[in-house]
UniProtKB/Swiss-Prot annotation:
Protein name, UniProt field: 3-isopropylmalate dehydrogenase
Gene from which the chain derives: leuB
A single BP term in Gene Ontology: L-leucine biosynthetic process
Superkingdom of origin organism: Bacteria
Site positions (Important for catalysis): 128, 179
Species whose genome carries this gene: Frankia casuarinae (strain DSM 45818 / CECT 9043 / HFP020203 / CcI3)
Pathway field: Amino-acid biosynthesis; L-leucine biosynthesis; L-leucine from 3-methyl-2-oxobutanoate: step 3/4
């Protein structure tokens, strides 16, 4: 496995080190190359993602990212210059976010709900494609537009990916989330595409939720969802709700995928760089380790992925039973690696 590693900023390098520890515990044949990308590089050189580095990244099987950013970088610089550029250059059209409440993890929701879903979010279109503009900026007559771009090609490939994932899961249930009563043009495209692809997956039950209703049900009845497919912006919002109801973004993993394998997919914890605790071994690497499980599964190493996922689940359960003890970042990583290897 040829793995590009972007530790990034703040706690990023610390949690990535433990993710690599766990990865090597189950898959020793890993050839890693580290890249200095993020806020530090921007402060020193003004660069976000040089073309030469982009071409080097292209030659890897996958990318493991820690976290990027610090308060001194203007908003949008790293998001568009690094993260979104990687997404568009490598055609990461599927953003995959598991939403699972592990045994022993407390949810802010009452009643210990059963939560186990995945959100398949379109990653390269919608309002984040960068279309739009500003007229008469700074005047009382300023006009700002952000356009949502949705193509049949882009929608269909994400819908098919979601159906394939639903077809492999026990419940075989797919929910399309959109707002087709107001966003009638894009909503119609999404709804028609789901309806036209559905006959190819006769065992998958399909339903629809408006995004406002889905947001409510994520909180009041999350067990009704199995696989959710949605557009870029709605998925961005729903997945953060999903993280909040399953222990917080500190446990949330994600994958930015090109399912075809033509380009390297990127895996990362959802949390930020947390510069206030950087270098103090206080960060929890669990989300990074869960992202490693997704990386392994994506590259076809299902058995190793299952071992890492089981290690995460057992560690979280034991952690809840142990109470207030707070191991260091390294200690958590060593424990997870031992569980995965054993």
């Amino acid at each position: 496995m040829r793995l590009a590693v972007i530790g990034g900023d703040g706690i990023g390098p610390e949690v990535v080190a433990e993710g690599l520890r766990v990865l090597r515990a189950v898959h020793p044949k890993v050839d890693t190359t580290e890249y200095d990308l993020g806020a530090r590089r921007w402060h020193e050189t003004g660069e976000t993602l040089p073309d030469s580095v982009l071409e080097e990244l292209r030659g890897h099987d996958a990318i493991l990212l820690g976290a990027v950013g610090d308060p001194g970088v203007p908003s949008g610089v790293l998001e568009r210059g690094l993260l979104l550029r990687l997404r568009f250059e490598f055609d990461h059209h599927v953003n995959l976010r598991p939403v699972r409440l592990y045994p022993g993890v407390r949810s802010p929701l009452a009643g210990d709900p059963a939560i186990d879903m995945i959100v398949v979010r379109e990653g390269t279109e919608g309002p984040y494609a960068g279309a739009g503009g500003v007229l008469r900026k700074g005047t009382p007559h300023e006009v700002a537009t952000e356009e949502s771009l949705n193509t049949r090609y882009g929608v269909e490939r994400v819908v098919r990916d979601a159906f394939r994932r639903a077809d492999r899961r026990e419940r075989r249930h797919l929910t399309l989330v959109h707002k087709n009563n107001v966003l009638t043009k894009a909503g119609d495209l999404w709804s028609r595409t789901v309806a036209e692809v559905a006959p190819e997956f006769p065992d998958v039950r399909v339903d629809y939720q408006h995004v406002d209703a889905a947001s409510m049900f994520f909180v009041t009845d999350p067990g009704r969802f199995d696989v959710v497919v949605t557009d870029n912006m709605f998925g961005d919002i729903l997945t953060d709700i999903g993280a909040a109801i399953t222990g917080g973004i500190g446990l949330a993993a994600s994958g930015n995928l090109d399912p075809s394998g033509v380009h390297p997919s990127m895996f990362e914890p959802v949390h930020g760089s947390a510069p206030d605790i950087a270098g103090r071994q206080l960060a929890d690497p669990t989300a990074t380790v869960a992202s490693v499980a997704m990386l392994l599964d994506h590259l076809g190493h299902a058995e190793e992925a299952a071992k890492v996922e089981a290690a995460v689940a057992s560690s979280l359960a034991d952690r809840a039973a142990a109470g207030a003890a707070q191991p260091s970042t390294r200690e958590r990583g060593e424990d997870l690696a031992a569980r995965a290897a054993g």
